[in-house]
């Protein structure tokens, strides 16, 4: 699963997921899966979508993951009273804004890429769309 090797601080504030996305263009591959909605992806969801795509293309071509879960999410144990400090880090998430390219693919036909991205999108909690590289 994806997570940072080391961080400056173990726990972070909740914060807000506002603003516009960076990384809105398909830059490595030919086809991409772009987020339409706003939300957060856990490391498990990113990995599940990657596996679905890899199986769909039968390990042909190349896949790039353009998001990385770098925000720790903490949870307190069950049946614990409030207070007594912040909970333990349970999982890592990537904050997603609309327009962000999540995955890219190259070396396969558009039909196969569309099928693979459809399978991957079913694993994700945000709305996505299929995009192709625009040649200037």
Curated annotation (Swiss-Prot):
<protein>
    <recommendedName>
        <fullName>Large ribosomal subunit protein uL16</fullName>
    </recommendedName>
</protein>
<dbReference type="InterPro" id="IPR036920">
    <property type="entry name" value="Ribosomal_uL16_sf"/>
</dbReference>
<dbReference type="InterPro" id="IPR020798">
    <property type="entry name" value="Ribosomal_uL16_CS"/>
</dbReference>
<dbReference type="GO" id="GO:0022625">
    <property type="term" value="C:cytosolic large ribosomal subunit"/>
</dbReference>
<keyword id="KW-0687">Ribonucleoprotein</keyword>
<dbReference type="Pfam" id="PF00252">
    <property type="entry name" value="Ribosomal_L16"/>
</dbReference>
<keyword id="KW-0820">tRNA-binding</keyword>
<dbReference type="GO" id="GO:0003735">
    <property type="term" value="F:structural constituent of ribosome"/>
</dbReference>
<dbReference type="InterPro" id="IPR000114">
    <property type="entry name" value="Ribosomal_uL16_bact-type"/>
</dbReference>
<keyword id="KW-0699">rRNA-binding</keyword>
<comment type="subunit">
    <text>Part of the 50S ribosomal subunit.</text>
</comment>
<dbReference type="GO" id="GO:0019843">
    <property type="term" value="F:rRNA binding"/>
</dbReference>
<comment type="function">
    <text>Binds 23S rRNA and is also seen to make contacts with the A and possibly P site tRNAs.</text>
</comment>
<keyword id="KW-0689">Ribosomal protein</keyword>
<keyword id="KW-0694">RNA-binding</keyword>
<dbReference type="InterPro" id="IPR016180">
    <property type="entry name" value="Ribosomal_uL16_dom"/>
</dbReference>
<dbReference type="GO" id="GO:0000049">
    <property type="term" value="F:tRNA binding"/>
</dbReference>
<dbReference type="InterPro" id="IPR047873">
    <property type="entry name" value="Ribosomal_uL16"/>
</dbReference>
<dbReference type="GO" id="GO:0006412">
    <property type="term" value="P:translation"/>
</dbReference>
<comment type="similarity">
    <text>Belongs to the universal ribosomal protein uL16 family.</text>
</comment>
């Amino acid at each position: 699963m994806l997570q940072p090797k080391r961080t400056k601080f173990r726990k972070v504030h909740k914060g807000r997921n506002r603003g516009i996305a960076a990384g809105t263009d398909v830059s490595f591959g030919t086809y991409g899966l772009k987020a339409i909605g706003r939300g957060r992806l856990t490391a498990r969801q990113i990995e599940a979508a990657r596996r679905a795509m890899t199986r769909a293309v039968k390990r042909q071509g190349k896949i790039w993951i353009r998001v990385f879960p770098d925000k720790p999410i903490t949870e307190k144990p069950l049946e614990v009273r409030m207070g007594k400090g912040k909970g333990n880090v349970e999982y890592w998430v990537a904050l997603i804004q609309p327009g962000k390219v999540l995955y890219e693919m190259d070396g396969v036909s558009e039909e196969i890429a569309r099928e693979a991205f459809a399978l991957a999108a079913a694993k994700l909690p945000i709305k996505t769309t299929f995009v192709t590289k625009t040649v200037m």
